[in-house]
Amino acid sequence: MTSVVLYTALIGAVLVERLAEQVVSKRHLRWAVARGGVEVCHGHYPAMVAVHTGLLAGAVAEVIWLDRPFVPLLGWPMLLLALACQALRWWCITTLGPHWNVLVVVIPGMTLVRSGPYRWLRHPNYVAVVVEGVALPLMHGAWLTALLFTVLNAGVLTVRIRCENRALATAAA
């Protein structure tokens, strides 16, 4: 098997993981709404989905269309970083439990979670998102995708983090 086939399969596995996140998120949304939860700041979500979808599609497209090689000295460390990002992401999800969602949902009376990775960082999942957005494409030399994702994701995260901070302040009040 060629490295391109293996890389495409890996990106496919990441896509399946993202779909699993959607399933978990829908379950958590039902739980939150049953407790009075309300979704806020939905306007940025389509852009976030587009940027993340573009990351996965763009990485594979760049590798194939621009014939990006797998360079072991860069590829293997990037694979390890991407795996670490997945571990951090699921640590965040399991720490937040039913409070975690891909949407911004405010549940009245709920206290902020300060355990797991939230002991050290207010938004640890976004550390995983930022690092993974560089690691996944660079794993197979797709540096243009890494660069474009980083720029677009910075805009999306700026809006998203402001929204979450407002929501967290409202929930804590």
Residue map of PLM features:
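Alpha-helical hydrophobic membrane-insertion segments
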Residues: 8-9, 61, 155
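N-terminal signal-anchor/start-transfer transmembrane helix
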Residues: 11-25
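Long, highly hydrophobic alpha-helical transmembrane signal-anchor segments
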Residues: 43-74
